[in-house]
Each structure stands twice: as C-alpha cells, then as structure tokens.
Amino acid sequence: MSNTPYNSSVPSIASMTQSSVSRSPNMHTATTPGANTSSNSPPLHMSSDSSKIKRKRNRIPLSCTICRKRKVKCDKLRPHCQQCTKTGVAHLCHYMEQTWAEEAEKELLKDNELKKLRERVKSLEKTLSKVHSSPSSNSLKSYNIPESSNLFMGSDEHTTLVNANTGSASSASHMHQQQQQQQQQEQQQDFSRSANANANSSSLSISNKYDNDELDLTKDFDLLHIKSNGTIHLGATHWLSIMKGDPYLKLLWGHIFAMREKLNEWYYQKNSYSKLKSSKCPINHAQAPPSAAAAATRKCPVDHSAFSSGMVAPKEETPLPRKCPVDHTMFSSGMIPPREDTSSQKRCPVDHTMYSAGMMPPKDETPSPFSTKAMIDHNKHTMNPPQSKCPVDHRNYMKDYPSDMANSSSNPASRCPIDHSSMKNTAALPASTHNTIPHHQPQSGSHARSHPAQNRKHDSYMTESEVLATLCEMLPPKRVIALFIEKFFKHLYPAIPILDEQNFKNHMNQMLSLSSMNPTVNNFGMSMPSSSTLENQPITQINLPKLSDSCNLGILIIILRLTWLSIPSNSCEVDLGEESGSFLVPNESSNMSASALTSMAKEESLLLKHETPVEALELCQKYLIKFDELSSISNNNVNLTTVQFAIFYNFYMKSASNDLTTLTNTNNTGMANPGHDSESHQILLSNITQMAFSCGLHRDPDNFPQLNATIPATSQDVSNNGSKKANPSTNPTLNNNMSAATTNSSSRSGSADSRSGSNPVNKKENQVSIERFKHTWRKIWYYIVSMDVNQSLSLGSPRLLRNLREFSDTKLPSASRIDYVRDIKELIIVKNFTLFFQIDLCIIAVLNHILNVSLARSVRKFELDSLINLLKNLTYGTENVNDVVSSLINKGLLPTSEGGSVDSNNDEIYGLPKLTDILNHGQHNQNLYADGRNTSSSDIDKKLDLPHESTTRALFFSKHMTIRMLLYLLNYILFTHYEPMGSEDPGTNILAKEYAQEALNFAMDGYRNCMIFFNNIRNTNSLFDYMNVILSYPCLDIGHRSLQFIVCLILRAKCGPLTGMRESSIITNGTSSGFNSSVEDEDVKVKQESSDELKKDDFMKDVNLDSGDSLAEILMSRMLLFQKLTKQLSKKYNYAIRMNKSTGFFVSLLNTPSKKPDSKSGGSSFMLGNWKHPKVSNMSGFLAGDKDQLQKCPVYQDALGFVSPTGANEGSAPMQGMSLQGSTARMGGTQLPPIRSYKPITYTSSNLRRMNETGEAEAKRRRFNDGYIDNNSNNDIPRGISPKPSNGLSSVQPLLSSFSMNQLYGGTIPTVPSLTNITSQMGALPSLDRITTNQINLPDPSRDEAFDNSIKQMTPMTSAFMNANTTIPSSTLNGNMNMNGAGTANTDTSANGSALSTLTSPQGSDLASNSATQYKPDLEDFLMQNSNFNGLMINPSSLVEVVGGYNDPNNLGRNDAVDFLPVDNVEIDGLVDFYRADFPIWE
C-alpha cells in the first residue's frame, strides 16, 4: 500500500499517551492477566494440577504489532515507532491497549473533547468577525441567522459536555482567556490580510456577492419514474437526474420526442391508405389436421381484425410457406388471443420474447408502427438452428389448459401446443418454468462442468436431502474449494470484510470435511497435494450440524461463484487500439519470481475448470435458508450468520449482474440491468437493516456482559461436532457465530487436550474468542452503514440510518482488543474501516445538502463551495481526513449526531493516499517518510510483505472516483444554476464558466479513471487483480455520468445561444440547403484541421472550454472511445448494454452530416445513398412505444410535462378560436417553468459569425407567400375560424407540423411557427399535447372512395390531422390551416382557400396521377425539414435511427432490445380508479 507524506504535527494526545507508556513496567504485574475488557474482573485462579502445566505470562506486549511480526526491537514511541517509519509502514504501527491505562484513556477522551470544542468556538468567532466586518447589513441578516443556526447544530450536547468536563470555574475562565487571546490574534491577522488583498478585491467581491444565493434542489433535480407496478423516486445523485436541470437537454428531448411522434405519423400514412388487394390469414391452414370436431370447436389464433387497420397480408406470388409450428388441434376455445375490448384477458400462449433468439421474422422497410397485435407470418420465418427454441410460454399456456390434457402423458403434444416435428433443425426443449438469462460464460481457457442437476426442475418441492445431494454434484472438488477460499481471503475479502477468516474456515472443515485429506498442514487445516486422486476428490457429504450452517453454505457458494468470476483470465478483453497505451499503469510482476508466477498461473488454470453454477445458490437460498421467508415474514431464525448471508447476497447481486435475473423475479422491462437501479436492492437493504436491529448490532457488544457466559457451553457443542440440539441455557445467536472461533483458538494454543475437547478451554482463549466475536459484530454494523451511504448516493434516495449517534453506540472495529501479530491483514482491515467511515461522513455531508428536503430547498452557494473545497483537499491530499471531518463539523456542514465524533485514537497518519501515488506505486515501488524523505534501498529490503496490498489500493482508487464524482456533481449543479442568469446579471458569467470548467475537469478525470481500470484488469499482477467484477459497474457508471456532461457541452458548442421565450424560434426549420457552399467549405476545412489535432490529442489531459470550434470534436472523440469500450464490455456485462445504447444514441444524434446536398434533386440526396430502414432490434424502445408508454418514462415526463388531454391551462383565459373541453377548463395541468434566453459558456464570436452566415443563406432561399408566418409579428396572421375538435382531438395544432400545412401552398417550406408565439402568453414551455398528438382514428378507405382519392394526394403529415368522426364535412376542411400567435389552429374556408383534392405533394403534381401502390411519401424531405435543432444540424439518417422505427411492446423486455431509459407498456396498477376522474396528472 502506498504511503503519502503528511505534514501533521504530533497531537497532544499522543504525547500524553507516550508519557503514560513510559511508566514503570512493574505496573503490569498487578493487572488482570489476559486481554480482559473489564477492569474489575477477578484474577485467573489456577487449578490444583496447574503445576504440571507450564505457566505462561499473561501480559500485554508493549512493542508495536509490526515490530513483533518482523521480530525486531521496537523503541515504543507513540504514535508510531522509528522502525515502522524507516520501513515505510508507519501507517500500520499499532499498539495494544493496556488494561491499566483505561482510566488514563478516559482522561484523554475528556481532553480531546475539550480540544474539539475550542476549535468549534474558534471557527464560530472567525465566522462572526467576518459577518460584522461586512459592509452590507442585508448580507448580515441573511448570512448570520442561518449560519449560526447551522453552526450551533447539536451545540446543546457540547455545552453539556463542557459543563461536565471542566469541573471548576477556574478552568472555564482559563479557557475564556485563551479564547480572547486567540480572537485578538485573528483580528490582527485579518487586518494584515485585508491590506494585502486590494488587488484581488474585484474577484472576491464577485464571489461574496453571490455567496448567499439560495438554490432549490428539490425541484431542479428530482425525478419520479412511473412504472407499471408503481413509482420510483430518483434523487439528484441518480444518473438520470442530470438532464432535468439542463435546459439544453430538456429542449433536445422535447425535439426528439416531437420528431418521434411525427415520424410515426409518416409511417402511419404510408401504410394506412394503400389499397388492400387481399387480406389473407398469414397462417397456412392446409397443414392443420382436417378434423371436423376440431374445426367446430377451435378457431385460428390470429386476430383477423388487425388486417383492417393497414396490415399487409402476404402476397399470392410468395412461395409456399413452411408448415405452421402451431398445432391448432391443441387450442381450446379459450385460447384465442383476446381483443382489446374483451373483459377476460387471457394471454397469448406464444412467447414472443423467444423470437429474439433467431425466430424473429425480417421487418419490412416501412413497418406499421401502430400495430400492437402479434402477427405470425410464417413465410418470412427463418429458423436459426443453434438458437431456435420453443416459442410457447408454458406458464401462460398451462394456466388455461385443461387439466386432463395437461396430465396426459400418452400424447407428447398434449403437453405443448407446438408440433415440434414440423420445426426443421430445431430440437424440442423440455418444458420449464425457469427462464434464465445466460450468465457469465467461461473464457476460452475455462472448461465448466456440465451438471445433470442443472437440468432438473426446481419448481417442485425438494427435500433437504435431495438439495444436499444435488449441491454435492455442483460443488467443485475439495482441493479446488480450498483454493477458492484462499483466493477470496487474499484478494476479495477487503471489499466485504464481514467474516472472521479462521471462524469461517473452521466451519467449512466441519461441513465439508476438507481437513480429512491431510490434517497436518497449514492454517486452513488441509494440504494442497498435486496428486490427481486427491485433486479430484469430490464432495460426497455436506454436514449441517447447526441451523446457521445453511447460511454458511450459502456464503461459501457465493464466494466460489464470485471468486471464479473475478479470476483475471475471466475478465473481458478490452482493445481500444492506439489509445490503450495511454491508460496503462505499471504492474508489480517484477517483484515476483518466475516460479511464483508459474505457480499462480497453474492455480488459475485449475480454478477456471471448476465453475460453480448459479443454480447452486438458488437451491441453497430457496430450500435450505428459505431467505424469502426470513426477510419478509419472520425473524425467529435471524442471527449474525443470517445477516452475513444477506449482505453477501446483496453484494453478489450488485457485482454479478448477469446472474441477477436467475436469482430474482424483478420486472426488468426497459432497464439494461435492474440490479443497480431498481428498487429491489432498496428493499433488501431495508430488510438487512431491520435484521441488524433485531440482533442488536446497533448497540456495542460491551454493553452486554452476558456474552461472556456463553463460551463454555458453545465450545462443548463444537467439540462434540454438535448435533442441532443446542444448550437451552445459551443464546442460539451466539452458538452459531462464536463456536468455531473458540475451537480455532483452541487449535492454535497447541494443547492436544483442548483440540480434543476433553478439557474446558482456558479463560484466556475464551476471552480471545469473545473479542473476535465482538470484532465481527462491529464490522458487520459499520459495513451496513457504508452500504446505506452507497445506496443513497447511487439512487438519490434518503438514507435509512440518519443521525447514527442518536440510536447507536457501536464502536469502530479499531476499538476491539485483538492481537493482530498473527493476522496483519486484519489490522489493515481495521484501519480501512476507520478511514472509510470518515470518508462516508464526508459523503453524508454532501448528501444532506442535496437530498434532505429541509436543506436542499434553500441550500446556499457558500455551503456548496465549502463542501467543494473540503472534498478537493481530501482527494488531492492537502488535508488529512480527520481535519476534513473536523472542518465539516466546525462549519456546521455535518452534525455531530451523524457520527462525527469518532474514536479519539484515530491514526492521523493513516489517510487516503494521493491518486497518483496509488497508480504509480508499481513503478516507483517506494514510500516516503512522514517528513517527506525518500526511503533507502536498505529500508526497502526490510519492508514487510503486506497481504492484499493491491486490493486495498484498488479500494482507495474507487474512493477517489466517488469523491471526484461528487465534486463533478456539485460543480454541475452550480453551473446549471448560474448559466441562465448571465443575460440578466453579467457577473454570473464568470461564476458559470468557472463551475463549468471544474465540472468538466472532474468529468474528464472520471472518464480517464474508467479507461484506466478497464485497460488494466487483464494485466498480470496489476493494481486491479481480482477486482474486475467488483469495481466494473462503479467505474463504468462514473464514466457514463461524465459522458452526460460531455453531451451537454457538445450541444452548447454546436447550438450556440438559446433564444429563449421572447425572441426568435428555439426550434427552427432550416434544412440542409440552407447552408451555402462557402460556409460548408469552411466547415470542412475546420473539421479537417480538428481531425489532425485529434490525432495528436492526449486523452490524459484536461479539456479547456476555450478550445473554440474544436471543443465539440475533442469531446466527440471521447464519446466514440467510450462507445467502443462499452461495446466490448457488453459481451460480458449486461449493464454495459444500456450505456452502449446511451452513448450510441447521442453519437448518432450529434454527428455532423457528412454529405453535401444536391441542389438539382431539391435536397433529396441529403440522405445517404445506401440508407435502409434500420432494424427494429437496433431501435431505442423507449422511443418506439406509444404515447401511454412514453408518459411513464421519467425523461419524457420532465422534458414535456404532464397536462390534460386538451392541453388547457388553469387560469388562462379562453383565446380567440380556442375551445375548452370538459373539466380541463377548470382543471390545469403541471407546467414546466419558463426557460430564459441566454448564451452558453462555450459561446464565441466565431459561433456568431457562422450562425449569421447560415441565417442569411436561409433567408435567401425562402420564398414568401400568403401562408408564411412572420415570427416577428403576431398580428400578420391569415384570418380563420376554429374548428370544433371532437373525440379528444385537440384544437391546438402540434408543434413542428405547420411545415406540412404550408406545403399545401405551392410546395414552399417556411419556418416552423415560433415557440415563443405558442407559449408567450402562458409563460411556460409547450405542453405535452401541444408537442405530441393523440392517436387518431382514421377512416376506413373502403367507406369513402372520394375521400381516399384526396388523401392519396396529400402530404403524409397533412392527413395526420384529419379525424374520421369529425362533425365537420370534408368540404369545410379543405381550407388553409395555420398557427396563430396563441397556438390556435385556424381554418380558412374562403374562396381563396384551396381544396384538398387539388393539393400536391412536395415532389410535384405528377404524383396525383399515380396509384396508391406507386406513391411513396417523401421521407427525405420530411427529415430535412426537421433536422435543425437551434442551429445544430442533426443527421437525418441518424434521426431516423434514434427516433424511427417501431418496436412491438411485447418485445421491450428482450435482452437485445434493452434501453438505456426506463419505459413500461402496462397500465399503472392501482391507478385505474383515477382514470378520467379530474386527475390530469395521471393521464
């Protein structure tokens, strides 16, 4: 582990402790022997035959643990000796506490408490002096009152301590005098500083001017994810919440969702109004059994009514289809797929999700996006032999199938309605209700065993003996199990250190008889023979003598599975090309001999051959532990071992995400990996917390003296190799956890009688066992506290264990009196617990100000600035973690009730090393003294070989990433707050740019660290050995978060200023032809120059916001590299699929069009020549759903907002030409706050010049006519009247649709009506119904031939606004429709209006003579007219890729169509009663 220099002075506590240690050593002889925790315990009385046993000196050593381990002389200096300092392990120098020093320790605690109080008073006085020196009285009021209230948080407690601990008026007066002196000195220093600060007065005044600004984070960064089965709240720290506070992302999503609606309308018009020559059933009934009885009682499972809405049937000239795999004779009358209006909803027996494995028919170039019914077109079915499976969902089929036929075994087809004999090259699979996702597959070098027990059905009840017999087949051989356990405790144990190593190994010996191979070897109790007979010795019997052994067996299975997944050879191969060399860190293989490397390679190759299947864990937790019942119903069998298993289970679910679907029944529709963002972990952690409360873990074990009385009975049970009959006088909770520790202590004592159990264990060993049990108790509790903090940080949810010290007095594991000389790695674990808890306190301080509603509603800028500065000092190593926590408490940013007053014996030298020292440890391979001196070669030779040092440094690496992610989040919040204020207050521009640059620096830091991790996981003996599974998701999540900010900056760099609500249009209608040749040539030159610079770009350097035009290209190159990384990681990790889709989504969207338009073809060649309709499997399903599905997407909800169906606003007067319907006239919807116009921090003069040139070229191209809408004048509007909407059709014309209306007047393409004109009178963004449209019931072409003829000649977008059930005659609809300034749809029925029958498409009037089958709507024109977003030209082909296409809602849950945004396609359960009950928010 790397050490960093700390310029910390030796505290007074250490000097007092040192003087205490220097007392006469004769004081030891009168103390109680053994490591007793009580000072008044009786001395040890020897038995009558004690003279025959050699007496041992029961004293506590004075030398430090490290010197005793190295067997060198210790000078006993405090806080660390010189020997440890010279060898570079001063941070591990540890002294066991003396029993006679307990009273002195209490005095030290009092003095330390007084010292902390003095520091707080000093900080308060300093703050008050600054307030009084402020020239503004307003700032005094606004600053003094809230600050004092925060600073004195918990002051009553400290005041009581002061009164209790001083004890005399003289000490209080003395302290008062010291405070006065310190105050005078500080005033003099402040006066001298003020004289030297005149040069920086301007910058300081700007900073001080906005210090008291309040931010309301409860509205800007909160999301509510509405799902089909409930709602989930996502706080400000969730990865989805970043877009809510950014106006650019809001408007971009609004544009994307609006485009998605328009593109669906285009597809609808293309397919709905073509003549259907034939409507044949796609199933060939000729192959069905011609049984008369069957024909009379059974029907075809295809819903033929679907063809009436535009579905094209197979043509007659198509080749003969294959035999239908559906056996129609097996369908009863109740198996027909239900219509939408049927009351009894019986699901279709065909499992459509199975088509993703190769049975999906190829899609047409223009599928019908509004078709939600399942069609089976066997003419286009392509069976993939290696992947084809039975398409029947047996769970839905067996529910409605007759029991007499289901139980029949004579006819194989009676069990499954599929005639498998007709499925060519497809093997029938046995029916199983256990659908699993393939978990991590072994790499090329691994050969997993195929267990027959994996193929058996697990849905039926299994007895305990059957489960144990099955597990014996699944578990690896004994020697392999021992190797896995050793690997776990060597590499993975520091990540979840809640076990007692010796205790756990002893349990495994009892259950699996591992020591029977050779009981005369290492501390595990078994040898590692190379003989093949011993190597392949299987597990023949599993002994479960106690009830808790089932939990120990479950922990073992998790350890076997997790360690196998973490083997470096099993990690994903990452090849980023030339950029890979930039992210490599030095490894430590040079420190190992060739023989050691060879031995390690042999062990890994042996372990790779023995994979423990995930089904073994399912069997254990379901039938042996019955964890579902324990965690939800009863706590009768809850003990420490149960809590340990629950923690391991939670840890495994988060780490091995590909196994998650096998273990849980979570509905993961629309989420790539529910294991990290779903509510399942929240429920499990709450259960773990309640079980910990039930076991009393929140109270320190020293409060329960009855723990000492259970050891003799426990040891007797263990020595007898215990049956399940426990001593009724003992505590069963302790029996299950302390027994093995006692036995292990007996085996280490060297006494044969103790090992055999014939004599009771002596008191010293009992005391050691008690202390180890208490130590495990404390470790479990503080690990739960850390889990709570991490979950709150990941999901943005409130913490469960708030104000920890108000209900818990459990001490840190460092308070345990254990001799670590035999277990140095446990000493490192103890040090890490203290350090990580202090880091968690820093994270808690941030979470309180962001997530707590009482603080987040009015958090002030200077509070966030203080958090930023302290976190920067911590991660850059300029301040020790103890000092950072003390500063947080003194400044009122962290209440003492959160646990700020940690134990007084914290090691100031054991802190968080610098990130550079962690990464470069293998290269320099040297440490520094505490005073900064380099170590010599002789000191390096004497350095102690520390266990799992690389794992500890990897954990330090993850802590740095977490802290810097918080710094990025805080800077991003302040940036999005001050950037829109620049147009009104220019002084905020400096602040906004500073915060943006800081946010970008920390985002790039997280991006680099993510790349460093994945580029080094497969290196031998690297920093991340065996940590590839545990740290993969945290690192990838931080990299994904940083890319979100990259998207924000690219939008600003490409779009320029937002035009706001009172100027020109936000979303313009420029096309590709709007660019003149000179501007495009200049763009090409700039792009070529930027590409040359990118070739020399160093990904390890920070990006400057002043990079100008190359900023977007630099950031885009990083997005492309991250997309390449996630694509490779998707092969192994499911959660990488979501991130790959997210990155690919924005890469496709933000790419600049690379092809110039052809003026001869009218711009139609703007599309790529080889463009084809993208495959449905590549679409983003959250954009392919219908409107009801999108309303459940949190991004959609926050980008557009919820409103009533008619889009009426509460309190707004009815405008001319607008009619209000029903209750919407009195019931308003939720509207988003208005967005003000402002210039982004990336705005430069070159952006202005290029935008002006673009605007001029666009103005030259336009042709004005009577239908043109002047954006600068709301009065120049054609006259018209408002048609009466009917059947839910809003009278408000949707945004982005007027271009198709204006195409009716001569084919010209004017600009889109200004968003300002639509919303200026309402003061808000356009509502949901103004941007999207309700689904329209279009007329049947067979009913009205004349109407169909007119529709054929309309543009595809125009016909989207015609309603079949309207009461207005079609002749009255043949008028000019436009949008006025109020957003009202107007119809001109004057004589000058042109009729629909005479309208032409943009391609000319010659299309009117074409037939319906020959006419094809012009998709390219449509895309070009909608590819401009605020000056950002979006590639039309990319636009189709990200918003086009249509996914069947039944396929949204497939693995290959997983989305990066959550969306559901089922109604919200429990809210059906509120439908249309004046609750527009649920509409």
Swiss-Prot record:
Region described as Heme-responsive: 244-444
Primary location: nucleus
Keyword Heme found: yes
Coiled-coil zones: 105-134
Ranges of Polar residues composition bias in the record: 1-50, 162-176, 432-447, 706-734, 1388-1411
Record-listed Zn(2+) 2 binding positions: 64, 81, 84, 93
DNA-binding region positions on the chain: 64-93
Record region (Disordered): 1-56, 162-208, 432-458, 706-767, 1266-1289, 1386-1411
Bias type Low complexity, positions: 177-208, 735-759
GO cellular component terms, semicolon-separated: nucleus
Positions of HRM repeats: 280-285, 299-304, 323-328, 347-352, 389-394, 415-420, 1192-1197
Domain of life: Eukaryota
Key words, A-Z: Activator, Coiled coil, DNA-binding, Heme, Iron, Metal-binding, Nucleus, Repeat, Transcription, Transcription regulation, Zinc
Name of this protein: Heme-responsive zinc finger transcription factor HAP1
Organism: Saccharomyces cerevisiae (strain JAY291)
Gene that encodes the chain: HAP1
